Amino acid sequence: MTRLLIVGPPGAGKGTQAKRIASEYGIPDVSTGDIFRQNIKDRTELGQQVQALVDAGNYVPDELTNRLVTARLQEEDARAGFLLDGYPRTLAQVAYLEELLQGWGQELDAVIQLVADEDEVVARLTRRAAEQGRADDGEEEIRHRQEVYVRETSPLIDVYRERGLLLEVDGLGEVDEVAERIRAALAGRGVRPSSDAGRA
C-alpha cells in the first residue's frame, strides 16, 4: 500500500506530477477540487452544501471537506493506497487525517513537497497568462497567490518535517526530470512504483 500527499505552490506543476505519480504507483490521484466538482455534478447532499458555500463566496469548512475526503478514501480504488492533492490544508485537517488513517490501521508513507523559486514560478505563470490572454492574472495577483500558499502550508510542512515524512523535491525543470527526482526520493523511502501500474 502506498499512501502519499503532494504539496507545491501554484505553477510548480503539482497537478501534472500528481497524475503521473498516481499512474506509475497504481494509486488514485485524490484531489479535493475534483471531489468537490464530482459531488456538485452528481448533486449529492454534500455536493449541494459545497455549491451553496461556493456560490456565497465562502470557504468549504473543515468538517465538510473531511467528510468528502473520508467518503472518497473508502471507495474501492483507494483501498490499496492513494495520492492526496489539495488536502490536508489546515492543522485540524492534518490531525483528522492522521486519526482517520490510524483508525484503519494505516499511516502516510511520505509527503512530497515540490519546491520552486518564487521568482521563476511567477515568471512562468506570467508568461502563461500572457499567452492565454488572461490580463487579470498579473504579477501582483500571482505573487499574492504564492504568499497565500506559503502562509497556509508552512505550518503543515513543519509538522510533516518534524515527523520525518517530508520529501523536498526541486519542482523546476522538465516534467520528466521532476518525475525522476520524485521517484528517486520515494525510492529512498522504500516506496517503489507498482508493477501492476497501468494494467487494467
Curated annotation (Swiss-Prot):
Question: Where is the protein found, in the record's own terms?
Answer: Cytoplasm
Residues at which ATP binds: G11, A12, G13, K14, G15, T16, R128, G173
Query: Which Pfam families does the entry link to?
Result: ADK (PF00406)
Region ranges (NMP)? 31-60
Name one cellular component (GO) term: cytoplasm
List the EC numbers from the record: 2.7.4.3
Q: Where is this region: LID?
A: 127-137
Q: Which major enzyme category is it?
A: transferase
**In what pathway does it function?**
Purine metabolism; AMP biosynthesis via salvage pathway; AMP from ADP: step 1/1
Q: So what does this thing catalyse?
A: AMP + ATP = 2 ADP
Record-level Gene Ontology MF annotations: adenylate kinase activity; ATP binding
Question: What is recorded about the domains?
Answer: Consists of three domains, a large central CORE domain and two small peripheral domains, NMPbind and LID, which undergo movements during catalysis. The LID domain closes over the site of phosphoryl transfer upon ATP binding. Assembling and dissambling the active center during each catalytic cycle provides an effective means to prevent ATP hydrolysis.
Q: What is this protein called?
A: Adenylate kinase
| Organism annotation | Clavibacter michiganensis subsp. michiganensis (strain NCPPB 382)
The major lineage groups are: Bacteria, Bacillati, Actinomycetota, Actinomycetes, Micrococcales
